[in-house]
Curated annotation (Swiss-Prot):
Reaction(s) this enzyme catalyzes, per UniProt: coproporphyrinogen III + O2 + 2 H(+) = protoporphyrinogen IX + 2 CO2 + 2 H2O
NCBIfam families found in the cross-reference section: PRK05330.1
Protein known as: Oxygen-dependent coproporphyrinogen-III oxidase
InterPro entries in the cross-refs: Coprogen_oxidase_aer (IPR001260), Coprogen_oxidase_aer_sf (IPR036406), Coprogen_oxidase_CS (IPR018375)
A GO term from the CC aspect: cytoplasm
Pathway: Porphyrin-containing compound metabolism; protoporphyrin-IX biosynthesis; protoporphyrinogen-IX from coproporphyrinogen-III (O2 route): step 1/1
Binding site for substrate: 104, 120-122
Cited SUPFAM superfamilies: Coproporphyrinogen III oxidase
Pfam (any one): Coprogen_oxidas
Gene name linked to the record: hemF
Length: 348
């Protein structure tokens, strides 16, 4: 790498302060927006300190009009000894003090027709090593194709403001990351996901060398994005969240539901809990770095259920979720999706 490339890949002089300010502002904007959307619920804030260095503020909304439970966290942690999960991915960071900051959010609505949603944007530094990561994904229980397309469109547009190739990789990467291997299904309908973005190399930096995201990244070739590009990406994607989710709530919040729909929602929430406890790297990182357990596990649903050997009734609305919406799809280009959803009144 040339010296000019080295310079291009250096973080901004005030990188840590700017990254912290960005995620704090995202937390504030999202919480204010969600309180307005809910109309009744209010976030309660609890600040905490990490003995080894740093801390954060956790905000939780319970028993609102729309949201059964939701949390929006901010954390800024630092230390001298890197957790194993980081060293295994970036061994060159070993021996350096480190800094990490981010905001994360999970919302569990009451109405089964309103999807659960997750967001996370973060920044990490350790000596010469730095990167941005983040994304947002939607987990419906009674999905609609129009809702799915709207969510994806908002996040694609945000990525496109930086580079029109980003979404080509980040969308399949999301499908790959939020995948329950033991269930052979995605957690939901996806969105975007990216990690270890330091402005160099291929866009895909995940673990599945033979997957779709990796294949597309190889076709695109090496990318040269700088710190400012990636900072702007996190900002654009973070600010795309409320416009991507609020219209879905407005369309679905007054739909009536029965015990049957509620039971299915709780059953599918069990899948959400399984992913977060078994596969999620953020959970693993937080526990390995002695983060605040209550905040780390805030993403878990307030209620969930498991049922041995459950199978949805054939051709039912529940079967549509497991047959179509828990598998990676090309939501915009595959026209067969419209016909299948129309049959189940799941188009709009």
């Amino acid at each position: 790498m040339s010296s000019s490339q080295d310079k291009a890949n250096l973080p901004a002089n005030n990188s840590r302060a700017r990254a912290k300010k960005l995620v704090l502002e995202l937390q504030d904007e999202i919480c204010a927006g969600l309180e307005t959307i809910d109309g009744e619920g209010k976030f309660l804030e609890e600040s905490w300190e990490r003995p080894e260095g740093g801390g954060g503020r956790s905000r939780v909304l319970k028993d609102g009009k729309i949201f059964e439970q939701g949390g929006v966290n901010f954390s800024e942690v630092h230390g001298n000894e890197l957790p194993p999960s980081i060293i295994s991915q970036r061994p060159e960071a070993k021996g350096h003090s480190w800094f990490a900051t981010g905001t994360s959010m999970v919302l569990h609505p009451k109405n089964p027709y309103i999807p659960t949603v997750h967001l996370n944007y973060r920044y990490f530094e350790a000596g010469p090593v730095w990167w941005f990561g983040g994304g947002a994904d939607l987990t419906p229980f009674y999905p609609y194709l129009s809702d799915t397309r709207h969510f994806h469109s908002c996040h694609k547009n945000a990525c496109d403001t930086i580079d029109k190739d980003l979404h080509k990789v980040f969308k399949p990467w999301c499908d790959e990351y939020f995948f329950l291997k033991h269930r052979n299904e995605t957690r939901g309908v996806g969105g975007i996901f990216y990690d270890y973005q330091d402005g160099s190399g291929l866009l895909y930096k995940g673990q599945n060398a033979n997957g779709k995201a990796s294949k597309i990244a190889k076709e695109l070739g090496e990318y040269s994005l700088n710190w400012e590009n990636l900072f702007s990406l996190a900002k654009a994607c973070g600010q795309a969240f409320l416009p991507s989710y609020e219209p879905i709530i407005k369309k679905r919040k007054n739909q009536s539901f029965s015990t049957k729909e509620r039971d299915f929602q709780l059953y599918r929430r069990g899948r959400y809990a399984e992913f977060n406890l078994v596969w999620d790297r953020g959970t693993i990182f937080g526990l390995q770095t002695n983060g605040r357990t209550e905040s780390i596990l805030m993403s878990l649903p307030p209620l969930a259920r498991w049922e041995y050997g459950y199978k949805p009734e054939e051709n039912s609305r529940e079967a549509l979720l497991t047959d179509l919406f828990t598998k990676p799809q090309d939501w915009f280009t595959d026209k067969s999706l419209e016909k299948r959803c129309l049959t189940h009144q799941a188009l709009d």
